[in-house]
Amino acid sequence: MAKNLVIVESPAKAATIEKYLGKNEYTVKASMGHLRDLPKSQLGIDVEARFEPKYIVVRGKNDLLKELLKQAAQADKVYLATDPDREGEAIAWHLAALLNISPQDPCRIEFNEITKTAVVEALKHARIIDDNKVNAQQARRVLDRIVGYKLSPLLWKKVRRGLSAGRVQSVAVRLICDREREIEAFEVTEYWSIHATMQKNDTSAASFEAELSTFEGKKLAISSAEMAESTIKELSQAEFLVEQVKRGDRQRKPYPPYITSTLQQDASHKLGYSAKKTMMLAQQLYEAGHITYMRTDSTRVSNEAQAQARQWVEANLGTRFLPATPPQYAKKAAQDAHEAIRPSLPEVSVNELPATLSRDQKRVYELIWKRFIASQMRPAIFDTMAVVIAAGKYGLRANGSILRFPGYLAVYSDAAEGQATAANDKLLPPLVESEPLTAEEIRPEQHFTEPPARFTEAAL
């Protein structure tokens, strides 16, 4: 019989950890989530006694509980290795109560990544269960139950049977309704812009686009077709001279590593995945040992992971892509000391993952890997050029930029993130102040103001 029992939440996580620890000294079992919860048939909260919750064993889990009790009785030591968040802490607390583990027993271990090094290190630093985390989860669970059980019947009565209300869901509905009222109240306004195709006298140079911006030094607003036509008529009779040329550079910094919300948003925008699907895939990658824990609001990264990322960049791209010191992405008020979402082994790119992973799993891993590696690299640098063109009382502007150093963009090959210039940037020909120009074409464009967009799942 194994000397130690380790309890985790899922069979996949159990299999990965048992592979690292071996079966001779450790048995790893899964609790399949919560073993104890509030009853479904009643409120389950004593509102007269400081909102004390009344827990029961989850239906269908009595046999599992008996098996865990048997294993715990035969083990020299029980370790509770549930997820490293409030929910995981609460599951560990329930397990300790059901398995008769003393509150003072240092039985709780946690790790942000399922690697052999992380698991073995966690076993060396077992601690007692954190009551503050447990109480935070219980407060949330009690509030969920009160809101759901009190509001849902009202919805049944006033709207339709079968509807439900929740602590988060109800607030989201309010946000959606408020936005819809903004949209309904929005009044569309017409406006126009004037664009000119400019050409140097040296016709071998490429033409470029400029936009009308000022009249007598003040910002110009064109509100009608008639005003646009009269403006174009005046411009067509004006002389165009380069009034000002400003050259400079612009840095485009990499984003910090993912947290839960930014991963969900990017997976929605770039992959078309729902938040639920993204978290399911991330959970699978975490349990298989490929990424760190995916429920986090921290952008902190361990020194070891940063060093591994820098080694990959140096070996594959060169030292010029590395900043002198590893970047720090500090975020105050993170719920705990979790790391950001990152690859467990930064040197493993998507092409080196096991063939057993699905296409969807690999796509999410690639998002996480690229974002993390890029976050440890130097910014991209663009040479910029801003030109002011005088045309009588009018002023036009043109902006251009060209990529001088790709920096973190070297990691990306997709157009969504790795494109060299922004969509509104243009390459301008060499220009000097007082240089005359010719307007090959002057054209108006009609626009209408748009109401606020409806929320997408990612935006919410």
Where are these regions (language model features)?
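Hydrophobic (often cysteine-bearing) scaffold residues that line and stabilize catalytic clefts
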Residues: 13, 88-91, 135, 139, ...
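An acidic- and aromatic-residue-enriched active-site/binding cleft used to recognize and process polar
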Residues: 11, 31-33, 83-89, 111-114, ...
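Intrinsically disordered, low-complexity regulatory segments
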Residues: 1-138, 150
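C-terminal or mid-to-C-terminal helical accessory/interaction module adjacent to the motor/catalytic core
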Residues: 74, 114-198, 244-251
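Extended, well-ordered alpha-helical scaffold/bundle regions in very large, multi-domain proteins
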Residues: 273-336, 341
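Conserved short loop/turn motifs at secondary-structure junctions
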Residues: 2, 83-84, 160-164, 247-256, ...
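A generic secondary-structure signal for well-formed alpha-helical elements
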Residues: 99-103, 150, 154, 239, ...
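Long, highly charged, low-complexity internal segments
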Residues: 19, 27, 36-57, 165-283, ...
